[in-house]
């Protein structure tokens, strides 16, 4: 990569197999069992950097100027860099690495998740929040829901982004929502929308998390909405992630009972007759088992003589 003074070089090694190395670890090079060179590891992890940048970073490491190295990584990694492997990379404990990171300018240090973010990247989170609100003014947001969608951002960094938008957002019951919207009406509207979607989807409802994403709901709010709809008897929960509108379920069960007058039902026949996935077919058959006139033999269902 670069020739230094005293016959030293920065060298990049490529290996056929994964090799665990750590900062400042000594090594020797052998050829035909003879030593032809040696040195110390500076950067044990591969960094997607151009040659000039890589040489600059390696010089910081060679001089053990870790503050400069951290500052370099902060600028080089748009979406933050981690300190989880700080001992392997710099021979620094987590505590020392965090302390050093806090001395940098324009950074947010997530101590819990051991991440360091340039504050400039906060704008991307804020822009994403604005995009959500433009698409759906009735969105219910949380740091947790944002972190699930912004894969590079930790929950704590997303929380900072939400707090920085107090001019656009109100906060109540752990939920951020568009300023000026009544929270009770917001909940009611999302309840109604969730029910209408499930009603429209019939016997093939989407998984809850997909519905939450569509309505821009954080998972806690979405779970609460489904819980309320279930308590009101409008929706029936058949499994961990299968909620079906009650009337659609009742209609399906009636169709199944009518079919049982002339044939048996099993997973395969349910899949074929109703065009269902195996998961849905099993859930509906298990619900059908609750009917007293249905008898299960092996994996087939029959009508009893009662």
Per-range role (PLM):
Residues 1-30, 36-45, 49, 220:
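Charged, often glycine-enriched C-terminal and inter-domain segments
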Residues 20, 35-306:
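C-terminal non-catalytic scaffold/interaction domains in large multidomain proteins
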């Amino acid at each position: 990569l670069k020739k230094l003074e005293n016959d030293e070089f920065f060298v990049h090694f490529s290996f056929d197999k994964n090799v665990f190395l750590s900062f400042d670890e000594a090594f020797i090079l052998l050829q035909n069992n003879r030593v032809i060179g040696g040195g110390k590891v500076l950067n044990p992890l591969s960094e997607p950097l151009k040659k000039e940048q890589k040489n600059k970073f390696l010089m910081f490491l060679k001089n053990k100027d870790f503050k400069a190295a951290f500052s370099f990584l902060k600028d080089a990694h748009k979406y933050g860099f981690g300190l989880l492997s700080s001992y392997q990379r710099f021979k620094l404990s987590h505590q020392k690495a965090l302390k050093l990171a806090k001395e940098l300018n324009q950074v947010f240090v997530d101590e819990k998740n051991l991440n360091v973010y340039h504050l400039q990247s906060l704008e991307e989170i804020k822009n994403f929040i604005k995009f959500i609100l433009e698409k759906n003014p009735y969105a219910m947001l949380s740091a947790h829901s944002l972190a699930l969608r912004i894969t590079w951002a930790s929950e704590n960094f997303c929380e900072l982004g939400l707090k920085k938008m107090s001019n656009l957002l109100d906060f109540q019951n752990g939920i951020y929502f568009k300023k000026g919207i009544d929270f009770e009406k917001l909940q009611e509207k999302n309840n109604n929308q969730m029910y209408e979607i499930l009603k429209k989807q019939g016997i093939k409802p989407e998984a809850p998390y997909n519905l939450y994403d569509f309505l821009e709901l954080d998972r806690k709010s979405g779970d609460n909405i489904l819980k309320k709809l279930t308590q009101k008897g409008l929706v029936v929960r058949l499994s961990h992630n299968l909620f079906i509108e009650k009337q659609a379920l009742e209609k399906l069960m009636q169709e199944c009972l009518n079919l049982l007058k002339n044939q048996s039902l099993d997973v395969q026949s349910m899949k074929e007759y109703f065009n269902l996935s195996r998961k849905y077919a099993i859930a509906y058959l298990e619900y059908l088992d609750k009917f007293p006139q249905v008898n299960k033999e092996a994996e087939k269902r029959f009508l009893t003589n009662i």
